[in-house]
Amino acid sequence: MTGRLLTFADEKPAEPGKRTDEVLVGISPAFADFFSQTITGLSHADVIRQILAGIEEQEVSARIVRVRHSSDLAVVAHTAAKLSGSGIAIGLLSRGTTMIHQRDLPRLSSLELFPQSPLMTLETYRQVGSNAAQYAKGESPEPVPTLNDQMARPRWQAKAALLHLKETEQIVQGAKPVEVIPQFAQALATN
């Protein structure tokens, strides 16, 4: 099977953005590091590509920061939003749970929340990027349409709990966010 691989390079301390036309993407400790795909098997490389494409389509710049001090989505997203020049950020956990946050909102609030990661598609991630970019431009986009499956929670709860435990094991207490640059590669075919 072939697929995309994703690594992050050039880790440097994340600094507050100076551009008012940027969206930060905050990734969790294990994203494209300990884990390489979401709970349903979407590659992290494809997820990041789609989010960045959605941002780029709106002609807004993007940066990515890794938040190592927490595996809580609200903390990841709000930390990134506080560093974003526009005040808008996307938080992204390894299992695929996503949130669009704004710097001046309380940490546990958000502009848009996508809690059912098993229902996220690559198209949804692209729309998340697009909406975040529209918020960064001062627009009020229609919320990204989401699916709702009452059985998703019981069906995926055990796996989600295990993934969260593994993600939490990757936390580095007191670590400051670092800015990272994505590097994409094509995986080799295996038999």
Regions found by a protein language model. Name each.
Residues 48-81:
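Active-site rim loops that border cofactor/substrate pockets in soluble metabolic enzymes
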Residues 51-59, 84, 88, 132-136, ...:
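Structural signal for hydrophobic packing residues in well-ordered secondary-structure cores
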Residues 6-12, 74-77:
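Glycine-rich, charged/polar anion/phosphate-binding loops
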Residues 71-108:
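Glycine-rich phosphate-binding loop
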Residues 39, 108-191:
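C-terminal binding/interaction regions
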Residues 9-59:
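Glycine-rich phosphate/diphosphate-binding loop of Rossmann-like nucleotide-binding domains
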Residues 18-22, 60, 84-87, 180:
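Short coil/turn connectors at secondary-structure junctions
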Residues 1, 42-46, 50, 71, ...:
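Conserved active-site and cofactor/substrate-binding residues in soluble primary-metabolism enzymes
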